[in-house]
Amino acid sequence: FPEHRIIRQDAPWQIDFIINEVKVTFFSKGAVAVSFNVGDYTIPYKNINICEADVISVLKMASIAQRNTIRDYYDLYYLAKYHMSLLEIIERTKTLIPNLSPITYSETLVYTEDIDEATIAEHLQPTEIVTKEQIADFFTNELIKIKGEI
């Protein structure tokens, strides 16, 4: 990618780039513990394989179950708000990671107090600037809508 810069490298697990003003993270195997082969769910794009949005949402659910970063919450928020419903994300996650703790689908989604950063804008220039409290409120409202279905 000619227009890129490395913004974070956590060898050997992950490397973050800004490519054409978009943050892109590449994970190695083992960066986030998942019980499925992520490579089976990728599609080729130029010289790399990428996951489609539904699998990225599953990886984000696994990420927030293991660590709390504003980036993961923001990505999951954005996917749930603009690309697929939270119910679809939860159902897909239950299919691909059946042993993920049920607490992830409720308390973990809405508990953002232990995230150090207040907003994703401290790191990047996101499409939508929201605080961690707004993200928690969004997930709370979405969970209320689907409480009988999960």
Identify the meaning behind each predicted range.
Residues 1-150:
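Compositionally biased terminal segments of proteins
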